[in-house]
Amino acid sequence: MNWREIAVTVSSAGEEAVADLFYQLGCPGVSVEDPELLQSYVESGNWDYHDFGEIALTGTSVVKGYICEDHELQPKLRQLDEGLKELLQRFPEWVLQVKGLTVQEEDWATSWKAYFKPVRIGRHFLIKPSWEEVTPLPEDIILELDPGMAFGTGTHATTSLCLETLEETVKPDMRIFDLGTGSGILAIAAAKLGAQVEAIDLDSVAVKVAQENVELNQVADRISVRQGDLGTVLQGQADLVVANIIADVILMLIPDLKRIMKEDGEFLASGIIGHRSSDVEAGLGEHGLEVLEKKEDSGWVLLRARWQRASL
């Protein structure tokens, strides 16, 4: 099967919005090449990138989406063009260049593996690609992953912020809802910290990948993975609700927290680009939640919130 790769060069501030356009088109694969993020891992010493040479810090990212070359290709390209034009009108400094080429499915489905290496997150997590060998320390909690075409390798700031916060927050036998589980990395991390996790995703590919990773990590007894939205899949209330998605989707989820989160529960919201943090904070406040903690990394924000006493 052939796929049309569309590469959009955009300022780092606009990568989330462009990626969202691709997701709206139903792209099964979206990648973000962010030189500043790459440089941060080189400087941390946790990731070996010597094979890739010097990294040029341009202040821009390349967001790539993959669209099947079938009868829907041209309508989707027109929809993408309209979306990019709308972004240009609102943020003329964002979209700089758009390129397209045809690639074979096996090329884009596996080429990213060259960039995914073992990496340490927080105090104890060691993220290990399934095809890599590592020598763990006795205290390491190994998260073995093959993310395939699902979001979540742990290397992006949004995911690493969540992992660090889970390590600080999760207690044994907590009940956790992971909304938009992607590769399942956050659910697996929480399970290895002793929690019982219900992970959901709208994307059937993500659900399949997450289930495979759950089995790979031998935590199937602590995690259930299901396809659907929180309104139709989740029952009862959780001690902790985690959503590493994007700001607009988080804002849509907030009104449902009253139903799915316990009175003494907490909400972790990540995937929030810096300039949208105030919108999410306002949305939380409007629905009776107070922000306990705000973390930032590489222009991305995580918010930890709980119910205000007066709202219960």
Swiss-Prot record:
InterPro entries (alphabetical): Ribosomal_L11_MeTrfase_PrmA, Ribosomal_PrmA_MeTrfase, SAM-dependent_MTases_sf
Q: Which SUPFAM superfamilies match?
A: S-adenosyl-L-methionine-dependent methyltransferases
Q: Which Gene3D superfamilies match?
A: Vaccinia Virus protein VP39
Instruction: Drop me one GO molecular function for this one.
Output: protein-lysine N-methyltransferase activity
**What subcellular locations does the record give?**
Cytoplasm
- Record's keyword terms, sorted: Cytoplasm, Methyltransferase, S-adenosyl-L-methionine, Transferase
Query: Where does this protein hold S-adenosyl-L-methionine?
Result: T159, G180, D201, N244
| BP GO terms, sorted | methylation
Q: Write down the EC number.
A: 2.1.1.-
Known catalytic reactions: L-lysyl-[protein] + 3 S-adenosyl-L-methionine = N(6),N(6),N(6)-trimethyl-L-lysyl-[protein] + 3 S-adenosyl-L-homocysteine + 3 H(+)
Q: Is Nucleotidyltransferase one of the keywords UniProt gives this record?
A: no
One GO cellular component term of this record is: cytoplasm
User: Which HAMAP family does this UniProt record tie to the protein?
Assistant: Methyltr_PrmA (MF_00735)
* Protein family per UniProt: Belongs to the methyltransferase superfamily. PrmA family.
Q: Please explain the role this protein plays, according to its UniProt record.
A: Methylates ribosomal protein L11.
The entry's protein name is Ribosomal protein L11 methyltransferase
Source species taxonomy = Bacteria, Bacillati, Bacillota, Clostridia, Eubacteriales
Gene behind the chain: prmA
